[in-house]
A protein has these predicted regions:
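Conserved helicase motor
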Residues: 225-239, 386-389, 403-420, 435-441
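Accessory nucleic-acid engagement/destabilization modules that flank
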Residues: 1-132
Length: 447
């Protein structure tokens, strides 16, 4: 401490845990500063940084601890450890998360005065705020509003009567999916004494609008955004609300977390302490995967395997929420036999007919110049293309007044500004021509 002589307490602690037969705990102790080590092999030497190497390493004698500390009885490992290697690895990560977060918090409390952590409202209080917000929809006017109200009511009832498990919410565009999923999540959390709601979104292009909706309903102080577009510095001289959110972002100690698929799954499969601190706080949470059809196909198996672990072993509930539900049940059947998905939306096929607002017409091949001329002739139009270069070329040939180009090359703040301008022009009935790549297809609201 304070510049004194360093000792390899990580390796020493791991060796003690290994002697007690606690290999997952040994991994966690060995990596609580440098990150979870690779297991390695029995041929590894003491010079290797693997787990096998660390267990062979000679460290300074430390037997004196036995005269000063008595280890508590170590409980047997959970039954899940008999399942398979993946389950064992996942359990090790959760154990590691508990250790590194506790280590950070203990050090923080020792080195400084207590910090403002865990100050959000309870699930009960948030559910009351949601009910107050949705009370204005209790007497819906018009067929579509009645259907939205029916979907919201069905999700609320399912949460009030449901248990932890795997769910799907298949709601067509315009059906009120965001608020309905929140109603289910909070109702389920209250009924089953769960800790938080985590909303996982594939793209940063829609994360702002979701966080804004939740903040309006629940209060900004209860909603944590955590993704690459948000910078948290955790400096004590920051504005108090920003400082509290910076602290909460370290371990997701917040009632509602809005994050990206990248942040969520890379944390589950990462090995650094800063990534893994939050993992134990995913346990006993309701996790909503918005736009679930956009789970990356090359990584679909590890994503589904992680979701199954959270539901089966860590008291979580998962909701796959989308307007175009992917066929994931067969993959769950393969990776987690017996884990069945329950649909929350009443009569999904019927809802699609009611909310249908588009007509498909096959135009065949169009020259880009012809397409550009047709777009320029429209007062309000949206054109989605599959290449950024094409989007820019089409945009360059449109009248500059009221024309917009949306691609992933835009900074998030600039994209947010343009979307707000688009919404205002549509609201005011002004000319508005939007050329976009597929980023707008993932649920971006423009009206």
């Amino acid at each position: 401490l304070q510049g004194g002589e360093k000792v390899d307490h990580s390796t020493a602690g791991a060796q003690v845990a290994a002697r007690y037969g606690q290999i997952p705990l040994a991994f966690a102790i060995a990596g609580h500063h440098s990150g979870l080590p690779d297991g390695g092999g029995r041929s590894d030497t003491a010079q290797d940084a693997t787990m096998f190497g660390r267990l062979k390493k000679s460290v300074e004698p430390y037997t004196q601890w036995t005269n000063e500390i008595k280890l508590p009885s170590i409980p047997p490992q959970p039954e899940m450890m008999k399942e398979n290697r993946f389950t064992q690895a996942f359990y090790t990560r959760m154990l590691y998360s508990c250790l590194v977060d506790a280590d950070y918090l203990d050090t923080e409390n020792f080195m400084s005065s207590p910090k403002p952590r865990g100050q959000g409202q309870t699930m009960d209080e948030l559910l009351k705020r949601l009910n107050q917000y949705t009370a204005k929809w209790s007497h819906p006017q018009g067929t579509l509003n009645q259907r939205r109200s029916s979907i919201l009511s069905a999700c609320t009832t399912a949460g009030q009567t449901g248990r932890r498990g795997l769910y799907s919410l298949t709601v067509p565009t315009g059906g009120g999916k965001t608020v309905a999923s929140l109603a289910f999540a909070l109702s389920l959390a209250v009924k089953n004494h769960m800790d938080r709601v985590i909303y996982v979104i594939p793209y940063t292009s829609i994360i702002d609008q979701t966080a804004d909706v939740f903040s309006e309903i629940l209060g900004a102080e209860n909603v944590l955004e955590h993704h690459s577009g948000v910078d948290y510095s955790a400096k004590e001289d920051d504005e108090p609300a920003a400082y509290r959110k910076a602290l909460a972002a370290e371990n997701w100690d917040a009632p509602v977390v809005v994050t990206t698929s990248v942040q969520f799954f890379e944390s589950l499969y990462g090995n650094h302490a800063s990534q893994c601190r939050k993992l134990h706080n995913i346990a006993n949470s309701v996790v909503i995967f918005d736009e679930a059809q956009n789970l990356p196909v090359p990584y679909l198996r590890p994503c589904v395997a992680a979701i199954a672990q959270l539901v089966q072993h860590y008291r979580a509930a998962a909701v796959l929420c989308t307007a175009t539900q992917p066929a994931l049940q067969p993959l769950f059947d393969e990776l987690a036999p017996g884990l069945q998905m329950t649909e929350l939306c009443p009569h999904p096929k019927e809802q699609y007919q009611a909310f249908r607002r588009t007509t498909l017409k096959m135009r065949g091949e169009l020259e880009q110049s012809q397409l550009g001329a047709e777009l320029a002739a429209q007062e309000q139009v949206l054109c989605i293309v599959n290449r950024r270069k094409t989007a820019q070329e089409l945009y360059n040939n449109l009248p500059k007044e009221g024309s917009y180009c949306l691609t992933t090359l835009l900074y998030p703040a600039h994209r947010k500004q343009l979307l707000q301008e688009i919404r205002e022009r549509l609201k005011d009935g002004l000319p508005c021509r939007v050329i976009s790549t597929s980023l707008i297809e993932a649920g971006v609201d423009v009206d």
